[in-house]
Amino acid sequence: MEQSHQNLQSQFFIEHILQILPHRYPMLLVDRIIELQANKKIVAYKNITFNEDVFNGHFPNKPIFPGVLIVEGMAQTGGFLAFTSLWGFDPEIAKTKIVYFMTIDKVKFRIPVTPGDRLEYHLEVLKHKGMIWQVGGTAQVDGKVVAEAELKAMIAERD
């Protein structure tokens, strides 16, 4: 049953995120949700550290966080927004759902992300119909846009 959860808490820590998103190391790319307005917008972040496995090869002696992982982090953040907008903070329902990418559009990478950066994801709902969600927004470091994208996803039953 689809419903709206307008009275959600606005901040979620890693222990909450792990109860909603199915992603785990090394693919969980959201450390904290710092703002959430159901059916409207979300702000989250990931702390980028030199200890990320990806820096072993991207690139030795010049570590740059891959743009595709920035987009994945935006997608995970959007998935959290979509799920909690429909079902609130409900770990039991979360065990039965999964969010799948449908499209990735208007992607632009502007500034490299490097160790020590706090990568913030700022997303807003562009469209929503049933289990289909379209979100758009930016990834930012220190208030500067490092990437932008529009993402469409669907929430499905997890097998």
Swiss-Prot record:
Enzyme's top EC category: lyase
GO MF assignments: (3R)-hydroxyacyl-[acyl-carrier-protein] dehydratase activity
SUPFAM superfamilies: Thioesterase/thiol ester dehydrase-isomerase
InterPro entries per UniProt: FabA_FabZ, FabZ, HotDog_dom_sf
Catalytic reactions of this protein: a (3R)-hydroxyacyl-[ACP] = a (2E)-enoyl-[ACP] + H2O
Keywords, ordered alphabetically: Cytoplasm, Lipid A biosynthesis, Lipid biosynthesis, Lipid metabolism, Lyase
E.C. no: 4.2.1.59
Transit peptide in keyword set: no
Alphabetized Pfam families for the sequence: FabA
Active site residues according to the UniProt entry: H58
One of the GO biological process terms: lipid A biosynthetic process
A cellular-component GO term for this protein: membrane
Protein location: Cytoplasm
UniProt record similarity statement: Belongs to the thioester dehydratase family. FabZ subfamily.
Function: Involved in unsaturated fatty acids biosynthesis. Catalyzes the dehydration of short chain beta-hydroxyacyl-ACPs and long chain saturated and unsaturated beta-hydroxyacyl-ACPs.
Protein name, entry field: 3-hydroxyacyl-[acyl-carrier-protein] dehydratase FabZ
Lineage: Bacteria, Pseudomonadati, Campylobacterota, Epsilonproteobacteria, Campylobacterales
Designated gene of the protein: fabZ
